[in-house]
Amino acid sequence: MVKNYINIYNNLVNFTRNKKIFIIFTKEDTFGDRLLILLIHFAFFLKNYKNHEDKKTMQELYDYFFRQLELSIREIGYGDATINKKMKNYINVFHSMLNEIEGWNNLTLVEKSALIKNYLNTNEKVDKLSEYFDNRKSVV
């Protein structure tokens, strides 16, 4: 993995912009929903690449990702106090996701679907989402 983090970030963002994929995830096209989808993709990315890169590189990527996320939130127009509160919440949600996704390969389809459903708060096509992430291991 080359230390060109912008390409990784942009590719992950592009996953959330793909309308066909987005329709699978949720009925609503909101910033919050897209952010959750982005965080899930990033969690899978880190899970899949953590053993292929050194800790320093992975930490740099993590820092870059959340710096870019913060900049995006600022561009929307939120103030400093709101941004700090939102970023703390997003990082906590992300770490919870990352923790649960770590054992993804050992989960049943029902358990995988429950995990996804917990974060996206949807009953729509949850099994398809689990299959989506099973099939995207090498892509994400």
Name the predicted role of every residue range.
Residues 1-140:
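Surface/interface-facing alpha-helical segments and adjacent flexible terminal/loop regions used
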